[in-house]
Amino acid sequence: MPATLAVLSDIHANLPALEAVLADLDARLERGEVDAVYCLGDLVGYATWPNEVAALIRGRGIPTLAGNYDEGVGLNSDDCGCAYPTPDDEARGAESIGWTNGAVTAETRRYLRSLPRRLRITFEIPRRKSAEAIEILMVHGSPRRVNEYLFEDRPDASFVRMMEAAGADVMLFGHTHKPFHKALPSDDGRVRHAVNTGSVGKPKDGDPRAGYVLLTLDAERGKDDPGYCAARHVRVAYDVEAAARAVEASPLPDAFAAMLREAR
């Protein structure tokens, strides 16, 4: 039987977006459409509900990774490991992590510090008289660095080499806030799948709705068939204005509110 995993990432302290995604997932779980839920990190930063987001994810018992922002705040650092393109962006980023470090509770900081950098799942596939296993690797940025950006235009061969080195058939990651899925044939005959989940709380693809991915593994197919893994990117409407207005009412830069509205 196929199994479906829901994987979310990059919530970034946006509680209304997370609540909308969890409501969507609860309905799917009730209908038996989802078997498990995972989170790839970056719970905090840029918006106003870092403690509430961390508490909700933790309270749900969702297996969660540390994103680069979580690591920075977990260590009470002034560096989130982010790549800001301009001096103005860097200055706003410094304001964000400074405010977040002042806002989080000791309990939230301990939780962020406890999160692992990767999660590996072995999914067994009954096939003919033998059994194959799909190796699923979940990271925030890449297998090499928590803050490495893997964009869709990266050469396919680079993805394949990275996944071969990590022993992964399917790699799930976030960090760029831009969803995509690549099916990657390789020289050993198997097809590898690289899946960026997109972002729950701070999309950058022009669509302000919250995003996550449903990953379905088909037990009737082998790893030489691209169809053994299917990724469906889901978008969920939420009250973007409420999140943006909360940013504007806080000491955080107003630019972050515009980014929520414009998904950039």
Describe every region a protein language model picked out:
Residues 12-16, 45-48, 69-75, 120, ...:
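Active-site environment of divalent metal-dependent phosphoester hydrolases
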Residues 1-60:
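N-terminal active-site segment of His-dependent metallophosphoesterases
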Residues 1-6, 121-137, 185-193, 226-229:
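Beta-strand-turn-beta hairpins that frame and shape the catalytic cleft
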Residues 183-264:
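Acidic, His/Gly-rich catalytic cores of divalent-metal-dependent hydrolytic chemistry
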Residues 20-23, 52-55, 78-81, 152-153, ...:
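Short, glycine/charged-enriched secondary-structure capping and boundary segments
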Residues 8-9, 37-42, 63-68, 139, ...:
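Active-site neighborhood of phospho(di)ester-bond hydrolases with catalytic His/Asp-centered motifs
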Residues 32-33, 103-183, 264:
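His/acidic metal-ligating clusters that form di-metal
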Residues 53-54, 59-121, 133, 153-167:
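Active-site neighborhood of divalent metal-dependent phosphoester bond hydrolases
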